[in-house]
Amino acid sequence: GASANDKWNDLQISDSSIKLKLSKNISGAELRKEISINENESVIYQKHTFTGGEGRIPVGHHLMLKIPNKAFISFSDFEFAGTPPQPIESDSSLGRSVLKYPQNVTDLNLMQRFDNKLVDTSVYPFDTSHEDLYMIISKKDMPFGWSAVSCPDQGWLWYSIKNPDVLPNTVVWLSNGGRYY
């Protein structure tokens, strides 16, 4: 979409922050982005603001993490995690998915593979050469939701805090070299 692919114009740049405005409107709405850091913190703050416009649009954000060895994935309380109706890679000549599609679980330690064996998807990687996807549905009436990935061997932790009333779902795309194109 436009927010990922169109030009962002600088509004204000300092040593610790940048404010940008998307060059195109989305459904008539102006979109501004602010990214900032604070001295002596290892946190990147990000905020997007829509002004004006009409209608509804899907909103979300995503990150890409390079996991060199082993990582642990966790979330705030959730209703369930579900895979879509079809595998990400259903043509074995193009790629490989290992999770069962569709399925809903309440424990990431107990997801099913395509062969009905259980796999712990809270530890990554849980298999080799695969592309898989599941969505976390947040519990309602929570003041905030969070996602975290820790990589103790590398000494880092990534986390995100969100308002589950605004962003009720979290999509987890597990890309581990499972595409052959």
Question: Where do the model's predicted regions map?
Answer:
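Acidic, contiguous internal or C-terminal segments within carbohydrate-active enzymes
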Residues: 22-67
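A sequence-composition feature that detects small, non-aromatic residues
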Residues: 2-4, 29, 42, 58-60, ...
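A contiguous, surface-exposed recognition patch within enzymatic or periplasmic domains that forms
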Residues: 56-57, 66, 70-181
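Residue-level marker of positions within ordered structural domains that often coincide
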Residues: 15, 53, 154
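Extended, loop-rich substrate-binding clefts of extracytoplasmic carbohydrate-active enzymes
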Residues: 1-40, 74
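Intrinsically disordered, low-complexity boundary segments flanking structured domains
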Residues: 5-9, 16-21, 62, 133-136, ...
